């Protein structure tokens, strides 16, 4: 008889999330519409030459690559090796040198106080255990170092889109907190707790000019975004449910699309480790 342990359950959940993020082409989405967030976080975190940087849940490198361009020493980590491979290819094309390591944001394979700056943009927010992930950000940052995070807000387009598809996603159990809670000031302040000081937050809008119609937004997410692909795969041949999710996503996109422009709200957070 096999007895499941918390560690085994964590490994199973990590494997499920790794497979989900490998669906579609999240790297394409990140590079086409989310790339402007990279320089924003790099500047806010004060990254520059010689700074030891850890990028957590780095994806295909939207933050890691701009950080490396400043002359910083960057280690780029992610749970999904396919995304790290994409980042490596981009780095080679740009003549940049980074270190890469597959890692779970909830159990980073690094020593305490190892980095000057620890960053994550639209990444750590998707770790299932928010508190464990926040604790890890703080743990691996040196005292006096900087923690910087960008997350989608609950109230913005992306947060509402995630809420819309959540009931259809088998990998998201009812007891898991919504990812976009990282976009609420009070919530993320509570996660970081007494481990940081000088915490600052600011809401911003990512301007997206990729789509002409709400249907185009729907199609883009349905074809490229892992969580959406997972939702439709779970629906399967149920035409009624598929049509209902189609309707919800198109109507949501229409609320945020005006003259070919969307604005996706995010929360930028910076703090100093005590």
UniProtKB/Swiss-Prot annotation:
What is the protein name given in its UniProt record? Answer: Uncharacterized protein Rv1405c
Q: Record's CDD domains?
A: AdoMet_MTases
User: Cell membrane among the record's keywords?
Assistant: no
In the record, the note on similarity to other proteins reads: To M.tuberculosis Rv1403c.
Question: Which Gene Ontology terms cover its molecular function?
Answer: methyltransferase activity; S-adenosylmethionine-dependent methyltransferase activity
Q: Which Pfam families match?
A: Methyltransf_11
Q: What keyword terms does UniProt attach to this protein?
A: Signal
Which residue positions does the secretion signal occupy? 1-30
Superkingdom of the organism of origin: Bacteria
């Amino acid at each position: 008889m096999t007895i499941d342990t918390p560690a085994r359950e964590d490994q199973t959940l990590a494997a499920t999330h790794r497979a989900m993020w490998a669906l579609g082409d999240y790297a394409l989405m990140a590079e086409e519409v989310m790339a402007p967030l990279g320089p924003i976080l790099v500047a806010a975190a004060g990254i520059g030459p010689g700074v030891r940087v850890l990028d957590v849940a780095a994806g295909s490198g939207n933050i890691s690559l701009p950080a490396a361009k400043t002359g910083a020493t960057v280690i780029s980590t992610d749970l999904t090796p396919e995304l790290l491979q994409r980042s490596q290819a981009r780095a080679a094309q740009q003549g940049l040198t980074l270190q890469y390591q597959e890692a779970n944001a909830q159990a980073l394979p690094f020593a305490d106080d190892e980095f000057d700056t620890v960053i994550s943009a639209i990444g750590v927010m998707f770790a299932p255990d928010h508190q464990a992930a926040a604790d890890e950000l703080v743990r691996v940052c040196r005292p006096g170092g900087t923690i910087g995070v960008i997350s989608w807000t609950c109230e913005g387009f992306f947060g509402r889109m995630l809420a819309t598809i959540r009931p259809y996603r088998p990998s998201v159990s009812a007891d898991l907190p919504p990812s976009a809670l990282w976009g609420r000031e009070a919530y993320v302040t509570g996660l970081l707790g007494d481990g940081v000081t000088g915490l600052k937050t600011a809401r911003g809008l990512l301007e997206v000019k990729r789509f002409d119609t709400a249907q185009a937004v729907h199609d883009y997410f349905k074809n490229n975004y892992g969580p959406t692909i997972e939702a439709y795969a779970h629906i399967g041949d149920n035409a009624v449910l598929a049509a209902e999710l189609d309707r919800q996503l198109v109507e949501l996109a229409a609320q945020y699309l005006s003259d070919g422009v969307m604005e996706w709200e995010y929360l930028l957070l910076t703090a100093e480790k005590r």
